[in-house]
């Protein structure tokens, strides 16, 4: 089963890469871009037996750094996650 | 002083670290490969060197923090063994949960490689006892991800408990409150982005970093019940 894990920076965490990309888009003449934030998409292929709680544990322990990042899990069309993940 | 330098695939400051320890203490450290699940017994000091462990995959230090050897480093740190993480070593210690906060991409995007002035904010720690409180020292930085961030409550706590060991005198990489190095709650774990091991002999231009290792040697010698003279 395919599971997509989206890892994004928490609100308020400065994203220098996003800022640089934003500047580059403006340099290319694109108007109307208000902000750019860079995140990661991690695709997992897991057995059906792997519980949601276990995937969340994978995110907390390794895939995301809960100090600065949130994660969102998309599993067979469902979306779950912790957009307001607790700071460590 | 019985010491060890942990080596990960992609570490590149491990030998500089070993040489700095040898120069300051007179005894070369043991080099410990990351796959080892046990550290050598009787260690007085563990260093986690700089570099690009695991090619900085996922996040700087994230993969190294999960290596077998880090479980032993964690338990040694919990027993009070001094642990120093420099640059990638600092990143690894935060990823391993031994130090709070995170090191993000430098605010100006660029890799920064130059000498920087640091203020010694706490000269009472086992790592900083050879510096005067408030002294300005010069130590080089070489990093892309040294932008220290933590939530305000954590930053306040670090400041209030004297756990900010070093601060950049001038803004360097966007770090919150210009923090360059922090201590854990027990004071036996220090993480810092600047490289003290690159400033240990006159040929380096200055030797400001050497006093960090010498201070540590003092602390270890006292703990082991030897006089400083007997060791040096």
Task: Tell where the protein language model's regions lie, with residue ranges.
Chain A
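Long, contiguous binding/interaction regions
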Residues: 2-41, 47, 54-88
């Amino acid at each position: 089963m395919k599971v997509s894990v989206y890892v994004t920076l928490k609100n308020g965490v400065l994203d220098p890469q996003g800022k640089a990309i934003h500047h580059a888009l403006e340099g290319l003449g694109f108007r109307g871009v208000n902000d750019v934030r860079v995140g990661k998409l991690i695709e997992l292929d897991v057995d059906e037996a792997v519980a949601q709680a276990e995937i969340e544990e994978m995110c907390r322990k390794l895939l995301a750094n809960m100090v600065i990042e949130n994660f969102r899990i998309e599993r067979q069309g469902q979306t779950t996650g912790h957009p307001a993940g607790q700071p460590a | 002083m019985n010491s060890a330098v942990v080596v990960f695939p992609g570490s590149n400051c491990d030998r500089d670290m070993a040489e700095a320890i040898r120069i300051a203490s007179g005894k070369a450290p043991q080099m410990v490969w990351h796959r080892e699940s046990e550290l050598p017994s009787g260690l007085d000091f563990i260093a986690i060197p700089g570099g690009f462990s695991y090619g900085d995959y996922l996040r700087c230090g994230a993969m190294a923090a999960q290596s077998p050897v880090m479980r032993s480093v964690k338990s040694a740190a919990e027993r009070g063994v001094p642990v120093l993480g420099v640059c990638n070593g600092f990143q690894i210690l935060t990823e391993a949960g031994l130090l709070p906060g995170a090191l993000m991409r430098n605010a100006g995007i660029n890799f920064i490689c130059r000498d920087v002035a640091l203020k010694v904010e706490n000269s009472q720690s086992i790592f900083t006892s050879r510096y005067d409180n408030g002294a300005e020292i010069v130590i080089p930085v070489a990093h892309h991800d040294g932008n220290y961030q933590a939530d305000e409550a954590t930053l306040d706590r670090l400041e209030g408990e004297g756990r900010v060991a070093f601060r950049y005198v001038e803004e360097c990489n966007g770090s919150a409150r210009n923090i360059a190095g922090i201590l854990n709650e027990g004071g036996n774990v220090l993480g810092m982005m600047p490289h003290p091991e690159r400033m240990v002999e006159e040929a380096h231009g200055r030797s400001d970093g050497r006093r960090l290792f010498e201070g540590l040697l003092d602390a270890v010698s006292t703990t082991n019940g030897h006089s400083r003279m007997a060791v040096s």
